[in-house]
Amino acid sequence: VTVKNLEASVHARLQNHARATNRPFQELLQYYAMERFLYRLSKSPHRTRLVLKGALMLHVWDAPLARATKDLDFLGRLDNSLENLERVVREVCAAGVEPDGMAFDPATVRTERIKEDADYEGVRVRFVGLLGKARVAMQIDVGFGDVVTPGAETITYPVLLDFPAPELSGYPRETAVAEKFQAMVYLRTLNSRMKDFHDVWLLASQFTFDGAVLAKAIDAAPIAFTPEFTEKASTLAQWTAFRNKLRN
């Protein structure tokens, strides 16, 4: 199979999948690109240095109603300089793997500090993925310094088509919940990240947890669940807008 034929075949199969599942083609293309980047990461020397977290882990856990995302989130276990992250992502982009129709251009890799929260230490990486002539904007957010309890797990990321599945390091569910509680407590009434509440609800309703592992995260009685926060008009408006966004 030639490269062009493979690209066309993957494109057609993603279109068929989009029709069969009633999902936008562009959304599936984005997920396919992220999946194949993860596969390249899993075949690189950096597979344990970037621990997958965030919304994509909801798909690993096969959580119903998992929200859509366009970004890859990682915990970095490596030097957090912009130059190092740029080098690492370029190496992953250029990794030699079984042909899957995707290409990632190392020359497009750009890095910047994440400034959304002065106390959040992170790096954002942007680059371009290509499926034939179809361009996919890729974004990676890498955080540093978080403790993973009870420890990172080896995960198998689910694939859209029949290409090899990525096997790499990922967050345990307990750490995912604990981090979101931390954001709720830290941001207090300034919290506009409705996705944190959605994800905690989703995980709590679908899975069982070891209470001892979660106890420290919940023990502080987060202000996020007091009337001061939940009854604010701005909070209710944000939650309604977030729910409407999920339905679209």
Regions found by a protein language model. Give the residues of each.
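Structured mid-to-C-terminal alpha-helical surface segments
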Residues: V1-V51, V60-A68, L72, G76-N248
